[in-house]
């Protein structure tokens, strides 16, 4: 199925809308002390896609793997939102199994598993039976049911559903191919009202770089404390702003947007534009003057910037799987769904153990660890 599997310089990673599979992201992780690995591979279209048995087209693709040390003696290979290449459902497990075995020789000897944080669409998001009478998604089934379906056609039946997803597995994509008025019309009336209210009240959004890092971090600390979130060090965000963005085959355009009112920072966000997609990566806001709707001003500015820079879609990056008020991300769902767009559910994190015994111990230890990180 796969051939010409080889390492490649991460600077040569192919252009992609997936931020976490770019040379830019490799540089971010390298600045933070992680190892990164680029792997190139080829496949025939007929081996990957249903009803393409006569198509001999050769597909060339790649992945970025981040090597994460979990202790002094063991590491894992984490593949954030990769691979981008998404075969037909019946070939996915087989493809990923062969890819795992093909990249095994390139990984450190202490690597005990490969973790794919898949952006592939969830099988159950394509199934009408998994939506209720109101069109609300019921979510993924239990892990055993997921594993049974995912391992279809594999030789080793080796894939395990991770206990939690690291990157968001539910998001909303906005279509930016239409004009600004059409984009606004697709929003909920309350969202349009709040965007216009923030403008009337004098909220202004400006673009900053490293000079805005301290402003961002103060807002971020306030947000983390208010919502009981894990607090990342300022060096994490500094790495995002310092990373090389335009010297590779997969460039990125990073903007730190700050919403202000009368010179007072009220909200901030990181916008990253890669290929045809703008992505809302991180956000923070003050508890003061929330009635001025600065977060709405930020999102509208990010949407307009993305469109102006040639993006055809905008990723809202992370919501609850359904409008369930008891879910910790329900507030994000309610806010982001107001901007219109299509809800997308992905498969999330899947593990391919390289050392079964050590992997079993790792899973036990992971149950008690914090399950949501910036990665």
Regions found by a protein language model. Give the residues of each.
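Active-site/acyl-donor-binding loops of N-acyltransferases
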Residues: 2-14, 22, 43-49, 121, ...
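A conserved beta-strand-loop-helix scaffold within acyl/acetyltransferase catalytic domains
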Residues: 2-73, 120-123, 128, 139-141, ...
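Phosphate-centric recognition/catalysis
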Residues: 79
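Conserved glycine-rich acetyl-CoA-binding loop
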Residues: 85-94, 286-294
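Short secondary-structure subsegments characteristic of cysteine-rich extracellular domains
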Residues: 91-110
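Aromatic (often tryptophan-rich) hydrophobic motifs at membrane interfaces
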Residues: 101, 242-361
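Short acidic/polar active-site loop segments enriched in Thr and Asp
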Residues: 109-112, 312
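Acidic beta-strand-to-loop metal/phosphate-binding motif
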Residues: 111-119
């Amino acid at each position: 199925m796969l051939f010409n599997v080889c390492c490649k310089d991460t600077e040569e990673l192919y252009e992609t809308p997936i931020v976490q599979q770019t040379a830019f992201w490799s540089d971010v992780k390298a600045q933070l002390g992680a190892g990164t690995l680029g792997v190139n591979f080829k496949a025939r279209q007929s081996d990957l896609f249903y009803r393409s048995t006569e198509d001999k087209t050769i597909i060339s693709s790649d992945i970025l793997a981040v090597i994460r040390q979990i202790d002094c003696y063991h590491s894992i290979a984490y593949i954030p939102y990769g691979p981008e290449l998404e075969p037909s459902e019946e070939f996915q497990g087989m493809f990923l199994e062969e890819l795992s075995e093909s990249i095994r020789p390139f990984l450190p000897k202490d690597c005990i598993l490969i973790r794919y944080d898949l952006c592939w669409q969830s099988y159950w998001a394509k199934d009408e039976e998994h939506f209720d009478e109101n069109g609300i998604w019921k979510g993924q089934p239990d892990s055993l049911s997921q594993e049974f379906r995912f391992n279809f056609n594999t030789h080793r039946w080796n894939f395990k559903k991770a206990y939690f997803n690291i990157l968001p597995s539910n998001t909303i994509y906005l279509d930016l191919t239409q004009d600004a008025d059409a984009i606004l019309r697709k929003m909920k009336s309350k969202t349009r009202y709040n965007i216009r209210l923030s403008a009337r009240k004098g909220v202004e959004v400006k673009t900053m770089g490293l000079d805005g890092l301290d402003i961002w971090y103060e807002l971020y600390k306030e947000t983390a404390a208010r919502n009981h979130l894990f607090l990342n060090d300022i060096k994490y965000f500094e790495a995002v702003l310092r990373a090389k963005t335009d010297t590779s085959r997969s460039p990125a355009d990073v903007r730190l947007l700050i919403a202000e009112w009368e010179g007072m920072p009220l909200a901030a966000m990181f916008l990253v534009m890669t290929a045809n997609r703008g992505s809302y990566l991180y956000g923070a806001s003050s508890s003061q003057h929330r009635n001025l709707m600065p977060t709405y001003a930020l999102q509208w500015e990010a949407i307009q910037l993305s469109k102006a820079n040639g993006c055809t879609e905008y990723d809202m990056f992370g919501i609850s799987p359904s409008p369930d008020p008891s879910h910790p991300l329900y507030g994000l769902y309610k806010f982001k769904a107001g901007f219109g767009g299509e809800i997308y559910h992905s498969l999330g994190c899947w593990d391919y153990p390289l050392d079964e015994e050590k992997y079993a111990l790792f899973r036990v230890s992971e149950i008690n660890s914090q399950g949501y990180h910036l990665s």
